[in-house]
A protein has these predicted regions:
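Glycine-rich phosphate-binding loops that contact phosphosugars or nucleotide phosphates
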Residues: 102
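N-terminal positively charged helical leader segments and presequences
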Residues: 1-95
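RNA substrate-binding interface of SAM-dependent RNA methyltransferases
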Residues: 46, 72-75, 81-86, 108-109, ...
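Gly/Ser-rich helix-loop-strand patches that form or flank binding pockets
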Residues: 98
Length: 158
C-alpha cells in the first residue's frame, strides 16, 4: 500500500508550485528539474536518481507498472502525492500525460569529475534550442563512443 498525501484542490500550494515549475527560472532558483512520464521516472530510478517528490494521478496511467514504480520510489525515499485528474492536467507539460511527474534535484559536474581517456573524445555543442535536437545529438554521440557532451549556452533545459 502506498503512503501518499491526497491533493484535489487546484489552489493547493504544491499544485501552484508545480505549475510555476513549468518555467525554467523557478526550476533553476529551486535547483530542481521535472521528469514526466513512466519511462523517465523508471530510468531515473534505475540510475540511482531518487526524486524528492512524485505527483501521480492513476486516472492518467497508461500501463500496469506505475504502482510498482511508485512503491520502488517510495522505498528509496521519494515522498508521494496522489493528485486529482484535473490537478494533474493542470501541472502536466506533455501533450499526452502519463500520470506521473517527479521533482528531482539538479546536480553539477565539472570536467574534472569525469573519467576520460587521453586524449578524450568530447563533443561540445552550443545554443541547442529544441529538446528533440539535443536528444538526437546525445544518441548519436553515444553511438559514436563520445565520452562526454558539453553543452554551452544551453537554451534547452538539461
Amino acid at each position: 500500500m502506498l503512503d501518499a498525501e491526497q491533493i484535489s484542490s487546484l489552489q493547493n500550494d504544491r499544485i501552484k508550485n508545480l505549475v510555476k515549475l513549468r518555467n525554467r527560472r523557478p526550476r533553476d532558483q529551486q535547483r530542481i528539474f521535472l521528469a514526466e512520464g513512466y519511462r523517465a521516472m523508471s530510468r531515473a530510478l534505475e540510475k540511482g536518481i531518487v526524486p524528492r517528490e512524485i505527483y501521480f494521478s492513476p486516472d492518467w496511467f497508461q500501463g500496469e507498472n506505475e504502482m510498482d514504480l511508485l512503491k520502488r520510489a517510495q522505498s528509496q525515499g521519494s515522498k508521494l502525492f496522489e493528485i486529482s485528474k484535473i490537478a494533474f492536467e493542470k501541472v502536466a507539460y506533455r501533450d499526452r500525460p502519463e500520470g506521473i511527474i517527479g521533482i528531482i534535484s539538479q546536480w553539477n559536474y565539472s570536467i574534472k569529475d569525469l573519467a576520460l581517456s587521453n586524449p578524450p573524445f568530447l563533443l561540445i555543442v552550443e545554443s541547442i534550442e529544441k529538446p528533440g535536437n539535443l536528444g538526437t545529438i546525445l544518441r548519436t554521440a553515444d553511438a559514436a563512443g563520445v565520452e562526454a557532451v558539453i553543452c554551452c549556452d544551453s537554451v534547452t533545459n538539461l
